[in-house]
C-alpha cells in the first residue's frame, strides 16, 4: 500500500535561540528602546508560532491516529498586528514602543536600507485556519503574553551572538524614524 503521511504547514517560528535571527531582530531593537521603522505598505495582520508550541504540535500529530493522510496549518491562535507585537516586545524589555510608518520607497532610498523589511511585516494578511488541527489533535498555543516576556528575558540574559540583521545601521534607522516623524508632524500642522 501507500505510505501514510501528514503535512503540517507552519508560519515563521519565533522564540528564544531562533536560528533564523527573526526574533533577535525584534528583541534587539526592543532592548535598546528606540523606535522601529515599519514600511507603511506592510502592516497586515499575521500569525506566527512560538517554538515550544511548534515542537508540541509535531509530537501531538505523531501521536494521533486522526492525522494520517491529512494536511494541517498550525500557528498561534491570536491574530497579531505589528502594533500589538511591538507593544508586547518593548514592554517586556522595559520600554514603550514607538513605530515610524515610512513608505517603502523612502526607506529603500536610504543607504544600507535597500532590502529593509522587518520580519513579519507583510503587505497582505497571513492568517491560517487552525480548526482542523484544533479538532484532530487538540492543537492549542501558549498565549503570546506568556512567551514573549520569557523570550525577551532569554535574549537579554543569555544571548551572546552577533547583532541582528541590519543592526549595524541602527543609528541611521533611528535617525530616519526621527526625521520622518518630525517631517510628518510639520506637514500635519499645515492642515
Where are these regions (language model features)?
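Mid/C-terminal beta-alpha module of Rossmann-like enzyme folds, strongest
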Residues: 60-118, 149-150, 161-191
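Conserved beta-loop-beta element that borders a ligand/cofactor-binding pocket
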Residues: 1-17
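Generic structural signal for alpha-helix termini and adjacent loop/cap motifs
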Residues: 33, 64-65, 157-158
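Conserved C-terminal active-site "lid" loop/helix of NAD(P)H-dependent oxidoreductases
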Residues: 51, 109-140, 159-161, 172-173
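A short C-terminal helix-loop "cap" of Rossmann-like NAD(P)-dependent dehydrogenase/epimerase domains
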Residues: 27-39, 95-100, 104-105
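A structural signal for short, well-ordered beta-strand segments and their strand-loop junctions
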Residues: 6-9, 37-38, 73
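Substrate-positioning beta->alpha
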Residues: 20-26, 39-62, 69-70
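Conserved loop-to-helix N-cap of the C-terminal "lid" that shapes the substrate pocket in Rossmann-like
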Residues: 7, 42, 47-55, 71, ...
Amino acid at each position: 500500500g501507500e505510505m501514510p503521511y501528514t503535512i503540517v504547514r507552519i508560519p515563521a517560528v519565533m522564540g528564544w535561540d531562533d536560528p533564523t535571527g527573526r526574533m533577535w531582530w525584534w528583541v534587539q531593537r526592543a532592548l535598546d528602546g528606540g523606535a522601529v521603522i515599519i514600511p507603511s505598505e506592510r502592516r497586515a495582520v499575521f500569525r506566527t508560532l512560538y517554538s515550544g508550541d511548534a515542537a508540541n504540535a509535531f509530537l501531538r500529530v505523531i501521536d494521533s491516529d486522526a492525522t494520517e493522510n491529512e494536511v494541517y496549518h498550525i500557528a498561534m491562535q491570536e491574530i497579531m498586528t505589528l502594533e500589538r507585537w511591538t507593544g508586547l516586545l518593548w514592554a517586556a524589555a522595559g520600554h514603550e514602543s514607538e513605530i515610524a510608518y515610512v513608505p517603502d520607497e523612502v526607506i529603500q532610498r536610504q543607504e544600507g536600507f535597500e532590502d529593509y523589511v522587518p520580519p513579519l511585516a507583510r503587505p497582505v494578511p497571513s492568517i491560517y485556519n487552525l480548526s482542523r488541527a484544533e479538532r484532530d489533535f487538540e492543537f492549542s498555543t501558549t498565549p503570546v503574553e506568556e512567551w514573549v516576556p520569557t523570550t525577551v528575558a532569554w535574549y537579554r540574559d543569555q544571548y551572546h551572538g552577533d547583532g541582528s540583521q541590519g543592526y549595524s545601521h541602527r543609528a541611521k534607522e533611528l535617525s530616519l524614524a526621527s526625521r520622518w516623524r518630525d517631517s510628518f508632524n510639520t506637514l500635519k500642522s499645515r492642515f
